[in-house]
Amino acid sequence: MSTPSATVAPVKRIPYAEASRALLRDSVLDAMRDLLLTRDWSAITLSDVARAAGISRQTIYNEFGSRQGLAQGYALRLADRLVDNVHASLDANVGNFYEAFLQGFRSFFAESAADPLVISLLTGVAKPDLLQLITTDSAPIITRASARLAPAFTDTWVATTDNDANVLSRAIVRLCLSYVSMPPEADHDVAADLARLITPFAERHGVINVP
């Protein structure tokens, strides 16, 4: 008697156009990052980035719209790293909110402090265009990063409600972005402070669904 074969769930494939666009954006942003390692943002043009990425200036314009749009795309990717760090730290510290937040925040702040665009923002000539991206014009970054971060609280051991996950996500993204534009003193452990601030809410509203 033969046993029924296990049903294999179909692999969700990313449409070609979507995958191609993501690859293009990453290639352009990687090229921009490489340029920022040796030049200040104020000295970089769309043509410079296009040459470094091996594509036309028009292609960059079509994808990002402008030099400011390119900077916003870079900032969005940096915010994605915050989401990835917090999600990974929750996976690595099941049942321990404080350690999860502490690890996630420390990883993000270390990465952002070493990021060439952030360094360019904080050094050299004033760059109001970059500062606007994470202050007055930060809504797109906050909205996207918060939406991506929320499932880390609803779909993991934390198991909050959607509403509480949104509260946590927005607070984390807004607070972390504020420290990118105005870093704390060198002897101040802001990651620990934020972990202490966020943990009580998460402990109160999370189910902590640990097997």
From Swiss-Prot:
Q: Give the GO cellular component terms, alphabetically.
A: cytoplasm
GO terms (molecular function) for this protein are: DNA-binding transcription factor activity; transcription cis-regulatory region binding
Q: Which InterPro entries match?
A: AlkX_C, Homeodomain-like_sf, HTH-type_TetR-like_transc_reg, HTH_TetR
Protein name, per record: HTH-type transcriptional regulator AlkX
The HTH tetR-type domain, residue ranges: 22-82
Q: Which PANTHER family match?
A: HTH-TYPE TRANSCRIPTIONAL REGULATOR BETI (PTHR30055:SF234), HTH-TYPE TRANSCRIPTIONAL REGULATOR RUTR (PTHR30055)
Q: Give the DNA-binding residue ranges.
A: 45-64
User: Gene behind this chain?
Assistant: alkX
Q: What does this protein do?
A: Represses the expression of the alkB-rubAB operon, which encodes the alkane hydroxylase AlkB and the rubredoxins RubA and RubB. Acts by binding to the promoter region of the operon. In addition, EMSA analysis show that AlkX can bind to the promoter region of mmpS1 and mmpL3 and to the intragenic region of mmpL11, suggesting that it may participate in the regulatory network that controls the expression of MmpL lipid transporters.
Its predominant location is: cytoplasm
Q: What is known of its domains?
A: Contains an N-terminal DNA-binding domain and a C-terminal ligand-binding regulatory domain. The C-terminal regulatory domain can bind saturated fatty acids.
* Entry keyword Transcription: yes
Q: Which organism is it from?
A: Mycobacterium tuberculosis (strain ATCC 25618 / H37Rv)
Q: Which GO terms describe its biological process?
A: regulation of DNA-templated transcription
Question: Which keywords does this chain's UniProt record carry?
Answer: Cytoplasm, DNA-binding, Repressor, Transcription, Transcription regulation
Phenotype of gene-disrupted mutants: Disruption of the gene affects the expression of about forty genes. The mutant survives better than the wild-type strain inside macrophages. It also has impaired biofilm formation, due to overexpression of the alkB-rubAB operon. Mutant does not show significant difference in the transcription of mmpL3 and mmpL11.
Q: Name one Pfam family in it.
A: TetR_N
Please give the activity regulation comment for this entry. Answer: DNA-binding activity may be regulated by fatty acids.
Q: Subunit structure, briefly?
A: Homodimer.
Task: Give the UniProt subcellular location, in the record's own words.
Answer: Cytoplasm
